[in-house]
Every structure is written in structure tokens, then in C-alpha cells.
From Swiss-Prot:
Gene3D superfamilies: DnaJ domain (1.10.287.110). PANTHER family: DNAJ HOMOLOG SUBFAMILY C MEMBER 14. This is DnaJ homolog dnj-5. Residues 660-724 form the J domain. Residues 510-525 have a biased composition (Basic residues). Residues 22-47, 494-505 have a biased composition (Polar residues). The gene is dnj-5. Residues 1-48, 122-142, 267-300, 338-399, 474-527 are annotated as: Disordered. Residues 1-11, 289-299, 351-386 have a biased composition (Basic and acidic residues). Keywords: Chaperone.
Amino acid sequence: MSSFDDPEKHFLGNLLEDDPGSSVTSATSPFAGINGSTSTALTSQVPTVGPVMCPTELSMSNAWPEPPPPYSPRHESWGLPSNANTTLLGSSSLTSSNWFPFTDQKETSSNEILSSLNLAAGSSSPALPSTPSRVPHHPSSQVHHFHHNLHHHTHTHNVQVQNHYFGAPPPGLESFGPTRTSSTSSSQIYDAIPNPSWNYTGLSNINADSNVLFSDWKNKNSSQTSPVSTVVSESSISSNLETRPVHPPLSPSEVVEIAKEKKNVSKSYAEHLSKSTAGTQKKGAPIGAEKKQKQELAKKMSNQLPIESIATRIVVKGQPHSAPVVSRMPFSYRDVAARSDHTSSSNHPNHQPDELQRKELSSADLKLNDSKAVRTKNNDHRETGKTRNTIDPTDFNKKNRVDNEFQKINNRKNKKEKAVTEVAAPVIFEGVHPVDSSSRYDVLKNLESPNQSYHEKKSANGRPPLIQKIFSRSSSPADDIIDTEEEDPHRVRSSSTHVHQNGNGQVKKDQRKRVAQVNQRRRKGRKEEPSWLQNAFSTFVDVLFFVWGYACFGLQWTLLLIVEVCQKIADIFVTFGKSLWAGTCKGLRNVILAFVYLCFFVVFAIKSVVVRLLTFINMIGAEESDETVEEQDWGCKKEIPIATNATEFADRLSRETIRDAYSVFGLRSDCSDDDIKRNYKRLAALVSPDKCTIDAADQVYELVDVAFSAIGYKDSRSEYTLENLKNNEVHEQLISVWNDMTKAVEEARNTIFCDCENTHFRVATSISPSQARSCKRCGVKHPAKQNDIWVEKRHLGLTSTYYTCTDNVVYDITSWATCKSQRAMLKNMRAHTHNVQYRLLSPMFKNSDFDAQSQYYNSSYPSSSTDARFLSDLQEEYSTLLRQRSLAQISFKNCEPREEDRSRRAANRRQKRWR
């Protein structure tokens, strides 16, 4: 190196000088045992730089005349026979189908590196039991030489490194020329792969002592034209197709990848270094479009018939060169270490993915007999060869940035497993060219964190999160459909298939068209909207069901209501029956009791009748004694003085018990005729209607006149005897007039004067005067005095009843007390008081009249003494009320003051004493 400014070069240079002796360290060749023997020179050269090396006596640190490509060439491979199956884990004696040199210039992803190494991520043993044990890795110096060579050409010499294509074997491998070998594969896909232009029969014939330098061999055998400038005529292709179908040559790794359905065209690991960032989207193409092209190309290559490869010699710019072409700065160890932190693979063991994918491939090969598909594929290849020189160099710049990115190394397992009855592809272990060393992968794997792969999680479709995130950003819905649909058993999947960046543009266009058609077929059909008639019918059905539901509900509710009403009616009938029965029983009992009572009543009635009959009989037997008694009771017992006023005389007549002519004048029956005439003259003058103003004056005067006509004369007096009393007409007239006068006097006596000029009557009651007034404070009934007035509440205090006591009779005076004129005075009366608040005042007379009056009263009248006492008490106070017309004149007097009045008077007396 010319300078050490780049830190990556420092890093690589230090690695180269760490272990210089490792370049000559002998190790077991991965190709040992292929043809039976291997020379010692080959044993020492293979683990170092491959089958083409510098002289063995030179040290690697100071001699590198013309290093071979650090990675696999593009079109032709060196060092392996057609039937060799070699891996880094060791050689196998299994035969493999013919494999072809690399024909594509597309970059190789990390998944393809793993596939070429035949290693499963996270496992240290081969996937199949027939694989031998793993051999040691190549020395680190060889890995460093590979990377050093890459940086040497790209940085130090500033050389536009390109891939070279050789039409002849390299020095020392002349015996591995093109040969025709028959296929021993049991699968159709390996028979479909054409024979290479030159093949290897083994590495045992390599001449280690060959003096031919690699530079001379390269100048001699390298092609003079680049792959871009190489033109294959359409006629030659057509002629070749007639005799032998043309097919681009494939490498052993591509054969295995095709068997695994992972790839269709292999890529070199060197081209992987030219990838750019993975998440950048190609301009004008959506993310995920490259994957569609890969899938289409995988289907195309898997169904294509064998085509004989065309060996082309390509020389870039007239000078061959051994280093690969890189369009961008390759990755350094720092970049790889930094990216490995973000793109870790899953640590789950791979459960033989190669066998499962070969099963899928064997089922997909059943479609190879379709002639239309074969013709379509061959036409595409002819168009590819025809337009190889006309490809626009800007197509490389339009490549999707996802393809230029370092693809994540993962171990994706196909979720769908085919039936066991399908014919599996033969087990083929991918052979790795000695130059295609796995040192790059080993370094990356050593830089990878173990915890990083352990915590990696896969998404639902089996991709790691980073790749899933890239494909989830697809702008086309069809991309998601193709990516997520894993249920199609006839679809061939490829996780790392890429279209060649320098390939035919028409192929890309065809692939895009086919992808669009696939997307169009897989697009879900738009759901047809119902018409207005369907909507109307559905609405009508909904309304009908709605109405029917409510109708059912109403019918159910009505039925329940009827049932409940019937139950209530039944309960009523039951209750009525019980009540009727109980009432009937009770009625019968009452009838029986009434009959018993009737019997007792009849008995008592008969008894009373008998008693009265006996009494009547006794009265008949004592007739004579009764007549004598009647003679003695005829007239007054003693002579009564004549009354001084008409009122007193009328009152005496109304209360007289013995009613005859002698009682009217107040004389005895044995009086003289002169006494009768004298009393007649005085009484006629006293009760004369012309002079008397009482209400019953006419009746009283008539009574006096009839009595005088009965006994005023001797002849009439002799006829008015006790024997003829019942047959005397004058006596009957006397009794009739007397009754009329009594009525008139009682009516006048019970009439109460009022200012309203209406007539108010007092009504006699059966209340005893001794227990007349009820007292609320004492809880007992006090006796009532003459003319006392009190009030009682009835009907829950709603009505008031006023009473007064006169002549030892309690009268109801409510009509007079509730009159409009009297209400103002009596409305404040308190009911059920202990003391009497008001008293009723009667008309007064003079002492002479009173004395004369008292003389005419009957001694048997109970109220005579009471009236006299009352009149004597009130004579002085109410002298102005004397001689009034009414019989029942009333006045008020506070007989007993109220309690508050007493307290007020006592306070006044105390105040006077203080003064």
C-alpha cells in the first residue's frame, strides 16, 4: 500500500502482519479425496490462495505476483469436476449433476453465501446426515489476503476493477477441460441443466510444478471484449437452439440454490461488496418490486429446458484483470461490525430447510411439460442475448437500493411442507471453489454478537424484522398480496433471487408486466353495491319484522293482561263466595238471635198486659172510694188571692193541674156565690183585651167568662156537679178554651226578644240542671243556676250550642245566640269553662206586685222560690227594665270575672296600697 491515511487500510495491514507464517501452513484441502489423490503442492496451496498460487518458496507477505480473484469468477469456475460435491465441511463421494460457470453479474446476498457454504445459521453441523464432519476453517491470513487484494486494487492503484471471463482453464488445470458427462441425477431439474463448456474431472492432475504464470495464462485466455460488448447473433442462437437449447451456465451453488428454490442465477460474493444501503428505494420503482422480478425469474429458470451454455471470452478495455468490478467503496470490518448489531439472525436451529425446499422444487418441476411455457422462456433468452450490447449503462444506477444493500443473513424456514409422496431431489452439497473462500463469512460471523442472534425474532411471515420492515413499506397493495400469500402450493419461492443489473431491459419490462398481471389476478374483486330495489326490499323486510315483533309483543301483552284479569275476576268470585258464605252464616245467626229476642219480648208483653189488666180490675173494684176522693179534690184546696197583673194570672193558669170552673177563680168548691161574683169582676177587668197587652189576653178573658157561666148562677151551679161532669157541655167548653190559652201562654213564654224583629224560640231539653255545664279544667259537670248562659262545642269543634237554665229547665237558645244582632256579643264566649261568663235577665216587677204574685202561685210549682230569689238579687240593678212588654226580656251580667280580670284587679289594688 502507498499510504496509510485510511483507517481501514491500517486495520487490514495490521491484520496481514499479525500472522505471516500462516500463509504457508499446510492444512487439509477441502477437495481431498475427489479423484483419489492430491499432490502435496495442492495440499499446501489450497488453503492458502487456491489452486493458482505464486511459487511455494515465496512468502505471502513479500510475494504476490498476480493474485487470482479473491472471489469466484463471473462466467467460468475453476478447480472442481462435474461430479464433485465439496463443501467447507469436507468432501463427499456423492455424485452431483453438471454445474456451470457463473453467467450473471448480479451481486450475491448474504443468504446466498450461507447457501453456497451449505451452513445453517446457528448450527455447527451439516443439515444432512451424509455430510462428513467439519474441517478447520481457512487461515486468517488467506482471508486478509482476499480483502487486502480488494483494497489494493480499489484504493492503492485506483483501478476500475472488473470481472474477467476465461475460456480455458487456469495454469495447472489444463486437464479439467470441457468434457461431456452423462447425468446421473434422479431428478428432472438436474437433467435439465446443460453440460458446461469445460468441466473438471478432479484436482489430482493439477501440475504443481507448472511454470506457466497466471499473468501469461490470463493474457492468453482472457476475452478481448467485455460482457457488455459481447454480441451473440440471433442466427447463431437459433441454430444452437435447433441442435441444443441454449441455457446460461450455472455454478454448483446455483444448482443447489435452484434445488432449494432460493435462487435461479448465482452471484459472486465480490459483487456483494458493491451494494449500497438496504433501505433506499429505487427511483421510479416501489419497494418490493425487485422481489417480484426475482420470483418471476425463479419460475422462469426452474421451468426452462436445458440449453447449452455459450462460452464467451470477455476482455474489459483490452486488458485482462483479476480483481472484480466494484462500483462503490466496499465494506470495512467496522461497517460490518456496526451493521451486524442491527441485522442479527435468529438463533433457532434450522430443521433441514434444504430437503423441504427440494421437495417444493420437485413438485414445481411437474409443470415442465408445458410447451407454451418452454417457448416463452426460450424467446426471452434469445431477446436477452440479442440486446446485450444495447443495454443502457444507466440501468445499473436505477437498480433498487435494496439489492445493493448488504442482505441480512437469516435462516428462513419455509412454512408450507409438501406431501410425503412427492419425489425429493437428490442430496447435493454445494461445492465451493477454492478461490471462493468462506473467510469473509467467517469474519462476519466472528464479529457477530451471540446475544444478538439469540434475541432475534421473526415476523409472522418468517422474515427477520429488518427485511419485514423493508417489504412492509411497499406502496403497492399487490406487493403485500404476493408477499403474504403463502398458501399457493405451485408458487416457487426464492429468498435471495435477484435480476442481473446488466441484463436485458426487455426482460425487466416483461417481468414487470407479468407481475402486474399477477397482481391484477390476485386483486380482490370489488363488492357490488345493492340496488335501490334490493335496499327497498331489505328495508321493507326489516320494517315488516319490526312491526311483526311489536305485534307479537302486543299480542303477548294482551294475552297476559286477559289472563291476569281472569285471575283477578276468579279471585273476586272466590272472595265474594267466601264473604257470601260468611254473611249467610252471620245472617242466620242474627235471625236466630232475633227470634230469641222476639220470644222474650212476647213474654214480657204478655206479662205487662196481664199486670195492666189486673190493675184495671182493681180500679173497678174500688170505684166507690174513688168517687169520694174526687169530691174532695173538686176546686182549689185553698183560696188563692187575685193576681195583680195579667201576666202573672196567665202564668198561673198555664201551670194549674186541676182544671175546672172553681180553679179559674182560685176558689174552693164550697165557696159562696158572692165570692164567685167578686173574683169574676176583678179578673175580667185585669185580663180585659182592651186593657191587657199580653199575647194571650183574649184566650184568658174567654176562659174567665166560660167559668162564670158554669157556676155564676144557682141553677147552673146545681147542674155543674161531679156526677154530671162528664156529660156537661159547659165543662167541655171550659177545658177546650183552657188548652188553647195554655198553648198561647207557653209560646209567649218561650219567645225571646231580639233586635232583628224576628221570633226566636227557646227549646226545652232533657238535661238535668244539676249536671248541666261541662268543665274542661275539672273534667266534670257543674250544676246550672237560674238564667245561666254557657256554650259547648260539638262535632269536633265545628258547631257551637248555647244553653240557658230557666225555671229549673235547661233550654237550647242557639237560634237566638247565633243571630246577627247577638253574635257580636256572644262570639267571644269560651266553651267548657269553669265559671259562668253571662246570665239571662227576666222582666222585673214592683215589690207589691211581687208580693201579690207570690200569693197566687201554687205551692206545688217548683220554680216559685227560685224565681223569687233571682228577682230579689237583680231588683236594684235592673230597675229600668221593669214593666216591659215581653215575658222573657234578657240582659247580660258578668257574674264571675275571668281569671285575667282577677289578676288585673289584684294588681290595681296593690298599686293603690303602695300609693
